[in-house]
Amino acid sequence: MSGVSKAIVQPLLSWYDAGHRDLPWRSEPAPYRVWVSKIMLQQTRVEAVRGYFSRWMNALPDIPALAAADEAVYTKLWEGLGYYSRVRNLHRAAVLLCEEYGGELPADYDRLLALPGVGEYTAGAVASIAFGLPVPAVDGNVLRVAARLDNDFTPITDAKFKKQTRERFAALMPSDRPGDLNQSLMELGATVCLPNGAPRCDDCPIQHLCEGFHRGNAAVLPLRAAKKARRVENRTVLVVRCGQLVGLRQRPQKGLLAGLWELPSLDGHLSPDELRAALTEMGWSVRKLLSLRPAKHIFTHVEWHMNGVYVELDAPAPALTFVTPAELRDAYALPSAFRSFVSVLED
């Protein structure tokens, strides 16, 4: 057996050349396009990103355009992708790039790594794919491939395992095609060396070099450290109407969903009488309350269990911003947690 060694390089490149996925950021691997795609793909499936990527590039085709964009524009383009700190860091980095690098990404791994929101994987991907630098790009897919190749039972979330994997793949980088090798490893993990006990070993171009396969462990690898249980928060979410206008609230600038617009909500699951009393105490002039279908939304560390209530007011409520349905649709980015409740406004 071979495990992670130079023997995997040529079979992977040949397999990649024979038929990798046609993705919009691969057809034109300019630095900006690679960078944006890698940020979008963090915590998000490829199929979900395709449409977002095309819309983003049409609206903000280069770094100066992103740097000059208003927050409402780039957050609206990001609406539904979640993890909004990613898009804010993209904008911060674009401003910095215009100030220090003439609106271009530097062809240097360490300088890429110093940009807001750019970690080792993203820096390695941009450096190798866009600039041809021989550095690894190790994401979750690649960590899984490495664990199976080596029959390694170290949890892939272990910092030492990640560091060793980066070092080992760095030693394999071909000087002429580092980006393609990185992409072939990502492609293998995304399409063949699948997670959750479902590897398609018979379709793998490096099956003959895989220690995990030959020892019968591919389906049980990789190991992950036990996840901490998510905290559950009960909330009462309000779809507020005053005439033809919809009431929104902006979240604090720090914390979960920082700075985003949202449907107002109250802690806990409130009964109709409790809710009416709470809103009256807040100075709201309530005409009608109507219960909506409950919903749940899962964040990384917390779950929201939400009871929805349609609230019709006689007068605008204090501390809310009222917008038209068209403005809500076109100009305000609402987190996907509220999607099922916003759909009530379209009925």
Predicted regions and their residues:
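Intrinsically disordered, low-complexity, charged terminal extensions of DNA damage-control enzymes
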Residues: 1-22, 27, 190-347
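Catalytic cores of DNA base-excision repair glycosylases
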Residues: 3-4, 9-202, 206-219, 285
